[in-house]
Each structure stands twice: as structure tokens, then as C-alpha cells.
UniProtKB/Swiss-Prot annotation:
Gene giving rise to this polypeptide: upp
Catalytic activity: UMP + diphosphate = 5-phospho-alpha-D-ribose 1-diphosphate + uracil
Record GO terms (molecular function): GTP binding; magnesium ion binding; uracil phosphoribosyltransferase activity
Residues annotated as transmembrane: none
Co-factor: note: Binds 1 Mg(2+) ion per subunit. The magnesium is bound as Mg-PRPP.
Protein's pathway: Pyrimidine metabolism; UMP biosynthesis via salvage pathway; UMP from uracil: step 1/1
Species whose genome carries this gene: Leifsonia xyli subsp. xyli (strain CTCB07)
Protein name as it appears in the record: Uracil phosphoribosyltransferase
Length: 210
């Protein structure tokens, strides 16, 4: 498993505003979209392309286009939905699937309650959107779900991660082609399974339920 922590002052600035408990939901949503676009730029460095002939106003030349089959973007519901627009604005030709997962707040174990994905992901590059990599359970289960449908490589984009979640995810994805792109790696998890210092519950803050 490869881990890349994006190092950019704009990412750090936007993340600082997201962490602020006084940031209202509309601002939180807008900044999340902007931040994800920056992370997506890093995450798509290895996206597959193929050569194409194009005509400029001056002459013929060769360029590239994103290869078929199209990459698949998979937000983990519900908080991952807040990251979707930032991703597809950068890669609008990508296909979008959905995976609904929830964390049991007592056991911290993930459960799948919904999915809308192609049955066969052979030769597909998949990009999973999950803002908070806390225990690693939900993201690990989502990645396993994709590989069971024959995905060839998976990149997860997370705004924040805890070391415990990364360690659990590395164990769960051993031997698989997985890359994790992070906005920041935080200190630890608290006794409730939340990232510290973190930014709270991303889903609640995105949708104004706190």
C-alpha cells in the first residue's frame, strides 16, 4: 500500500478552515469541494491515457485522452458524497458508482447498506472517496468490495487519516495495488474512534446536522 500526504500550502490553509468548529456548513461544503480537487490532482497522476491525433488551429499534433474503460469514482455514502463534485470537476468523463457503508458506533465495524456499481470492474481504475480514515474499517471493506469485482487498482482519497486507520488498512489490503492520498495525517484516534485533532464528524458538518 502506498501512502501520499499532499504537501501544499493551499491544502493546509483550506484544511485549517475545515477544522475550525465555527465554520458553517455552506462554507464547509465549498471548501471540501476545493480541497478534494487539489487532492484529486495528486491522486490522478497515474490515470491511464492513450495517444490521440488532434487538429489545432495551426497544425496536426498528438495528444492523449483518458483510456477506456473509464475510471470509476466511488464515494462512500454519506460523507463521501460531499467529495464527489470536487473529483468529477477534474475528471468529468469518469463513471460514478455508489457504496453505502455505516459504522457501528459501539463496535466501530462497517456494514454495507447500499451499492450501485458495475458487476465487473475488470481493468478499471477506481477512486474511492472517504473524507475520514479513522479506524480503517469502512474504507477497508469498500476496497475489498471493489477487488472482489475484479478492480485492478484502487486509489482512495481522504481528507484526514489517523495512524491506527492506516495501519489497519495496510494489513487489510496486503498484496493489493492500493494507493492512499491524504490531506493530512493526524495524531491518533480517541476513545470514541474519532480522529484527533480531526474536524469532527465530516458528514454532520457537511450537511449541517450538528
Amino acid at each position: 500500500m502506498r501512502v501520499h500526504v499532499a504537501d501544499h500550502p493551499l491544502i493546509t490553509h483550506k484544511l485549517s478552515v475545515l477544522r475550525n468548529k465555527e465554520t458553517p456548513a455552506p462554507t464547509f461544503r465549498a471548501l471540501t469541494e476545493e480541497l478534494v480537487t487539489l487532492l484529486a490532482y495528486e491522486a490522478t497522476r497515474a490515470v491511464r491515457v492513450e495517444p490521440v491525433e488532434i487538429e489545432t488551429p495551426v497544425t496536426s499534433t498528438r495528444g492523449v485522452t483518458i483510456s477506456e474503460p473509464r475510471p470509476l469514482v466511488v464515494p462512500i455514502l454519506r460523507a463521501g458524497l460531499g467529495m464527489l463534485e470536487g473529483m468529477v470537476s477534474l475528471m468529468p468523463t469518469a463513471e460514478v458508482g455508489f457504496l453505502g457503508m455505516a459504522r457501528n458506533e459501539e463496535t466501530f465495524e462497517p456494514t454495507t447498506y447500499a451499492e450501485r456499481l458495475p458487476m465487473d470492474l475488470s481493468e478499471r481504475q477506481c477512486f474511492v472517496l472517504d473524507p475520514m480514515l479513522a479506524t480503517g474499517g469502512s474504507l477497508g471493506a469498500a476496497i475489498d468490495f471493489l477487488f472482489k469485482r475484479n478492480a485492478v487498482d484502487v486509489t482512495a482519497i481522504c481528507i484526514l487519516a489517523a495512524p491506527e486507520g492506516l495501519a489497519a488498512l495496510e494489513k487489510a489490503t496486503e498484496g493489493r495495488d492500493v494507493t492512499i492520498v491524504l490531506g493530512a495525517l493526524d495524531e491518533r484516534l480517541n476513545e470514541n474512534g474519532y480522529i484527533v485533532p480531526g474536524l469532527g464528524d465530516a458528514g454532520d458538518r457537511l450537511y449541517g446536522t450538528v
